[in-house]
A protein has these predicted regions:
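Electrostatic, structured charged patches in enzyme active sites and in nucleic-acid/phosphate-binding
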Residues: 2-156
Length: 156
């Protein structure tokens, strides 16, 4: 993870989506002609993965993790990224990474409990926690690491 922390310092978040065309398509796990980003943070992370020589392989929404949603239904979670990194020590480590605004990683403010905004934030938080719990389990079973990157990690 040393490598990842070294290079992600200059990201900006904006609501933005499109298709990313990799410079190094051989590094991409999946179809390199159909790489979708759903935010500018994701796009910049794609550029980082594509151009960083320590990242041996990467993918975006290429892994499917089944989970039981708060409504009891079985659903599928597509984490934002999979990366395989050669650490400075030479060790190869695999990560599943979710890129999210910090606000969505924390419980909503209880002071506003009666508002629609609170209910929406509480539902988003509960859904995210359920998905991320399934992702941690998935990673643990496969000797991988699960990370959530927020604006704090991305230097925004």
């Amino acid at each position: 993870m040393d490598t990842l922390n070294t290079y992600v310092g200059s990201f900006i978040f904006m609501a933005y989506s499109g298709y990313y065309k990799p410079i190094h398509p051989q590094k991409y796990r999946g179809n390199p002609t159909n790489i979708v980003y759903r935010s500018l943070w994701e796009r910049k992370f794609m550029v980082f993965c594509d151009n960083n020589p320590s990242i041996l392989q990467w993918g975006s929404e290429e892994i499917i993790i089944p989970y039981r949603a708060p409504d009891g239904k079985i659903r599928r979670y597509y984490p934002d990224f999979y990366i395989k990194v050669r650490e400075k020590s030479g060790k190869v480590t695999k990560y599943i990474i979710e890129v999210k605004p910090k606000k969505q990683t924390q419980p909503p403010n209880v002071k506003n409990k009666k508002t629609a905004k609170y209910r929406n934030e509480a539902l988003t938080y509960a859904k995210n926690q359920t998905k991320w719990s399934a992702a941690r389990e998935y990673c643990e079973d496969r000797q991988m690491n699960f990370l959530i990157l927020t604006e704090d990690h991305l230097g925004v």
